[in-house]
Amino acid sequence: MSKVRVVNFEPTSKGENTHLYTIENNSGASVTLCDLGASVVSIKVPDKNGSIRDVVLGYEHIDGYEFDGTYFGATVGRCCGRIAYGKFTLNGEDYQLPVNNGSNHLHGGFNSFSRKVWLAVVDDKVPNTVLFTLDSPDGDEGYPGNMKVFVRYTFDDENVLTIKWSAVSDKDTICNLTNHSYFNLNGHKSGKVTENHKLKINANSFIPINSNLNPTGEITPVKNTSFDFTEPKLIGNGIDRKNEQICFANGIDHMFVLNNSDEEFVLAAEAEGIDSGITLKCYTSQKGVHVYTANYVDVLSNMGKDSATYGENSAFCLETQGFPDAANHKTFPTTILKANENYTQTTKYIFGINK
């Protein structure tokens, strides 16, 4: 039975102590987590030749996780994605959230869950698992309700990373949680993923955005568009620079509506790093997966872990989540969490090898 290894990391700018938690399975693969942002710091899995590769982007020091705007590996909340102009109405009351991304509220605001140090619980009786908890007070970044949040990470001997989110609030509020890991299955230092990664998405439709990067409220078929990943294709083949949607976001930064999303657990996406042979399957209980092709990543070697430099399209994200800006689109499935009701969602990232 493998255990969780805990080491000190670095203090935040506020003097808060942080730690790294490494779950290593019996085959030598591992996942390392940080209590700042309940974040994924590394995922090390074997390639087709048996060599171990770290397949997520990350920072060398704590200040990258604390201040940079990429959200590498972070737990994002209370509400992931953009809320148009930071405004929504709940139970007849208008709310104005902090605007931290142009004219929008993004990923929970300036002091979102990704910027907070969570309490970590490691129990030897629960193998291969780290549980993070956070108390978010009423009014936190403008959201109503005292909220208790839990994120449980488990990494098993089959190289399956399971993330389970749960939350409860004493008032009606908005809740839409995700993990913002950036995957490069050829290794985090291997450069662009556009021409050496295949991606398949279990979605016949996606949600278009406007020039402000907010959902239009429509749900559009992917057929005959560059957003059609219903069969595996190179990620770069989906970035059609002549497509207005791609131009708005400088790449893919869109929600894909999953097929069979009324089922309890569905396949969201499959990917493969062609050079490494490492594969990734993503299953989720959520309605959709937001795919982001690292369109604005610019991390210099003095910040990237292992002195890595990360640029545009150096990774892709599979952010399983509820519909974006749902509070402002009544036709979208709601992201309202009712008082004293339980929010629970689960995602599995399954790593394998295509030899």
Language-model features: where?
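An exposed, glycine/acidic-rich loop-and-rim segment of catalytic or binding clefts
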Residues: S2-K355
